[in-house]
Structures are given as C-alpha cells and as structure tokens.
Amino acid sequence: MDDTYIKCILQKVESGEQSAAEAFEQLKVLPYEDLGYAKIDQHRNLRTGQTEVIFGQGKTPEQIAGIVTNMRKTNARVLITRAGEDAFAAVQRVDSSAEYRKQARIILVGGLPDESERTGRVAVVTAGTSDIPVAEEAAVSAEFFGLYVDRIFDVGVAGIHRLFDRLAVIRRADVVIVVAGMEGALASVVGGLVDAPVIAVPTSVGYGASFGGLSALLAMLNSCANGIGVMNIDNGYGAACLASKICSKQRKNRDENNANE
C-alpha cells in the first residue's frame, strides 16, 4: 500500500462514489491485517518507501498464497523471495499474473514497475558463474523496487581483464552490487575503480576453508577500498533493498532541487 491508495479512497468519498462506511471497512485494517499465521504490514511502504516482501523459506505454499491474496488487495505488485516451485504453483492458482524466476528463487506477482517509476540504475557484478543465483536474487529484487539493472557475470579476479572490458557499463551505475564467494576479493577491486557506492554480497560458494561464505564476508568487511557496505552471506535481496533506498533518495533530492530552481 502507498499514499496513492489512501488518497484514492478519500477522493471517492469526497466525490460521492463511495460511502464513508465503505471507506471505513477498507481503512480499518490499517496499519496491519492479522491472518493468524501472518500479520500483513499494510503501512510499510508509507513508512519506509518499500512494500513488505514475503520471505518464502519456512512458509507453506498455502500460507504464501494466502498472504499474496491479502496483499494484492492493496498492492499492485508482490515479491516472494526464497520460494520453490510448489509455492509458485500455489500462488499461480490464486493469481494468474504470477511468474517464477527459478534461478533467483523469486515469485513476482503483478509484474514490474513501468518506466515512469524507475529511480536509478544498479550494476550487479559477480566473481563467478556459481555466484549467479545470489546475483539474480539481487537483480530481480532491484527490478521489483524500480531500478534498471545491468548484469555483469563471471568477471572475478582470476581473470581480471574480463572486469576491465565491462568497466564502462559498471561505472554508469548509481550503485554497484558485487557478489563473490571464495576469498571475496572482487568487491575491493571494484571499490577501487568506481565512484558509486559498492554493496558487497559474500556467497557461500567455495571449498572447506571458505567456511560457507565466512571467509568472503570477513574479507569484504576488512576491505581497504572506500565506500563499501557489506551484506550478510547470500543476501542478494538485502543488497537490492539498500541500492533501491540509495537511488530513491537521490531521485527525491534531485526532484526537490529541480522544483526549487
């Protein structure tokens, strides 16, 4: 839900298209609606600029479908992360607009924002092909939040010349998300080459001493390159959220400056 939804209800009451009693029924579920197994945060977009997203892991397909049905009453689009094909089948039964991005393990309901809603551009860069599932979680989530996405995959430090060939594309981004496992060195390299904020995402890819992504996480936290923020292991979605907030704030500031000129 966003402020447009509430304004629309109030305008309908003002114009006589809707009664006060009908408006009350719609508004009384705010700021959240209790489904028993889930409490839907209807005001999250109003507070934070980002709608609530469903974390699919640990939820049954029926629970996910029920949450989607409820959220679609007040949200044009819904995103479900860490979702399997059984969850997708359940969601598709209640909403035919659902689509499944298998590599990202994401279900999209209601499509993606149109051009007028785009707030910025993000480059999603991976060290290796094995990092792509986490990168796709970041990329699809970023598209859901209204960002243009450039995907640059398999440009890790073992063949650094591959990165240099794509540097022009990376440098045009407002935010760069770097996804890397093993020793996680790519984030530091990119951080030393671009002027945009870098969001580093360590992945659990690697052999024994990578400790399921801990080595990459610690390497990224200890980076000597400036302007790098680090997400939790395999958290591509979190990187997209942060990138979206950065871009949305930049656009809001630009719009305000233009209005004051």
Regions found by a protein language model. Give the residues of each.
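Glycine-rich phosphate/diphosphate-binding loop of Rossmann-like nucleotide-binding domains
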Residues: E117-H161
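C-terminal binding/interaction regions
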Residues: T126, S130, F164-R171, V175, ...
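Short glycine/serine/threonine-rich phosphate/pyrophosphate-binding segments
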Residues: E62-I64, D131-E136, I160-H161, A180-V190, ...
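Long amphipathic alpha-helical segments
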Residues: M1-G84, F88, V94
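Glycine-rich oxoanion-binding loops at beta->alpha junctions
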Residues: I106-G110, Y148-V169, L214-S215, M231
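Short, structured coil segments at secondary-structure junctions
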Residues: V94-S96, L193-V194, C224-N226
